[in-house]
From Swiss-Prot:
This is RNA-binding protein PNO1. GO terms for molecular function: RNA binding. Expressed in liver, lung, spleen and kidney. Weakly expressed in thymus, testis and ovary. Weakly or not expressed in heart, brain, skeletal muscle, placenta, pancreas, prostate, small intestine, colon and peripheral blood leukocytes. GO terms for biological process: ribosomal small subunit biogenesis. Residues 1-10 have a biased composition (Polar residues). GO terms for cellular component: cytosol; nucleolus; nucleoplasm; nucleus; small-subunit processome. The lineage of its organism: Eukaryota, Metazoa, Chordata, Craniata, Vertebrata. Residues 1-71 are annotated as: Disordered. Disulfide bonds: none annotated. It comes from Homo sapiens. It is found in: Nucleus, Nucleolus. The gene is PNO1. The modification N-acetylmethionine is found at M1. The keyword Transmembrane does not apply. InterPro entries: KH-I_PNO1_first, KH_dom, KH_dom_type_1_sf, KH_PNO1_2nd. Residues 173-225 form the KH domain.
Amino acid sequence: MESEMETQSARAEEGFTQVTRKGGRRAKKRQAEQLSAAGEGGDAGRMDTEEARPAKRPVFPPLCGDGLLSGKEETRKIPVPANRYTPLKENWMKIFTPIVEHLGLQIRFNLKSRNVEIRTCKETKDVSALTKAADFVKAFILGFQVEDALALIRLDDLFLESFEITDVKPLKGDHLSRAIGRIAGKGGKTKFTIENVTRTRIVLADVKVHILGSFQNIKMARTAICNLILGNPPSKVYGNIRAVASRSADRF
């Protein structure tokens, strides 16, 4: 036995480590509690130092409109289909005047590319002028009257929305024609009623429907048109949109 103990001690001296029995569950639990307590103390100290030393946020000065417009000239191009050449030519001065005089932009009709081109210049003061002018011309190209499309320049909360009848219901042939007829009504009565109740403007161009108005009003008009496409009778649609319009009027 003594010789065995001597060999073990010699091995330990040579570099071998002795294996000792690990502690039980209680010892492990006690050790974990000590580590967690030390960690919480460290976190608390770290939080105290962070609160004492607040992070500095960078402060940038606000950009002015002149600074945004001082860069390169911006251009918008609106393609014109063949069926809108004549109306564009007849109403060119009504389109040209507000864009040039009120918004301070430059506009021309490119005969080669068949596009209406609008660009900024030194006289442009408003950052959003180019977008307003492009929406105005686009609304006229889609079929709206100049007086109705002009509201896109005067008011900020007006939008354009377009969708196809076949997006609501995949109709073909006579079924599609009947759906278009239900939206328009006899002599345009149904379309005019929806426009007056929802305070919007609607253009029916073949299978496409274009709506001009505020967000809430566009939503009401779109719901009414979708119900007509799905086959609801006009009298029921009238009642629904009048009820919704009266509720929204009371709310505001």
